[in-house]
Amino acid sequence: SKSITEVGHHLYAKGAILANLNWWLIAGELRPEWKGGHGGGEETAAVMGMDPALIHAEYLEEGEGIRNDVSDELPSASWMDVNFKGGSITIPRPIRSITDNGWLTHGMSIDPPTKATQAWGVEMLNTMAEYMRDFTVAFDKVALPKIK
């Protein structure tokens, strides 16, 4: 996000480096079948991998109830975007204005929460923990910037 980037710039000027590891993006880059959306299979599997009791399975079959909250001419394309003549336009608004249950897997139909399993979550979380560990070892060797 812009705020994290600004903090990173500030820290760099002070002689430090910020590394922002977005696990949900990296997981899909490491294994394309894990790529997902907000409230989709990827996030649901991650929660199942930690504690399956946290998932309300009775809601997994519910439809998303996506609304074109801005207008029919500007249909919802994602959480923050609407579609206009094939292009995505960002219009920041609360997720509840788009969907009642918080799921936004439309546009990412390969990632419905119904596909999530505990085994997927455990494998993904273990893979990401190993990746983050390996990154930390490599990042620890990076020379800090010189303060100007």
Language model segments and positions:
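Extended, histidine- and acidic-residue-enriched regions that form the cofactor-binding/catalytic faces
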Residues: 1-148
